[in-house]
Amino acid sequence: EELLGRARASAPRVSFVDNTFSRLLRELLSTLNPFNRVIFEKRLNGAVAIVPFEEALHGILLPLQEQVGQLWHDNHIDVAVEHYVTKHIQQKIFSAMNQLPVAEFGAKVVVACPPGEEHDIAALTVAYRCRVRGCRVYYLGANVPVASLANLCGKVEPDLTILSFPLALSDDKATELVQALANEVSPASNLAVGGHGAIAMRDLFVKYNITVLEDFAELDHKLDRLMRQSSSRA
């Protein structure tokens, strides 16, 4: 899962002792095999409710997604269980986003996953962090065709478009996609990419003047600059 491991390193330190989150994660994972829906939901809901969401996001939700993905990869849980956990994590992030005020001013940011990419937890996390900082966010989610992305950017004229790449593409597919982004999206918006795949394809992105974000700390720095620029134009 893209950016998830890096997110923990770049996130603010949580106020709870790390062992508390580690113990909770072990308890949550223990409910997945054998699968116990009631205990899983009670523990997850209870934990997220009692800490600030930023701490819950980086101390519980992102590590949980990362570890569940690894369990599925190692054939310790079924893909249906992995999807179940992922949907709960998505719901938590969407719920937190919906409690934030709708920005009428500030930098405009489009967040999406490229064509064929269905894993959107990291992209959703990016959208949340943009919302927290007062950006006007257009979150498009998974598997967005380049033509559709370009069409939207042409209409809303964003200050920045961020794409989430969890995995590197083959050389041919990467070249085709990056050229399409440069030709169709870049004329309407500055482009940035993040994730393990983006970092692996760094040279190709740099060749086409597309910014590669190393982690969430670098994202936050870029967003702060955008918001200052937006304020100065107001």
What are these regions (language model features)?
Residues 1-101:
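Long amphipathic alpha-helical segments
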Residues 75-234:
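C-terminal regulatory/effector modules of DNA-binding transcriptional regulators
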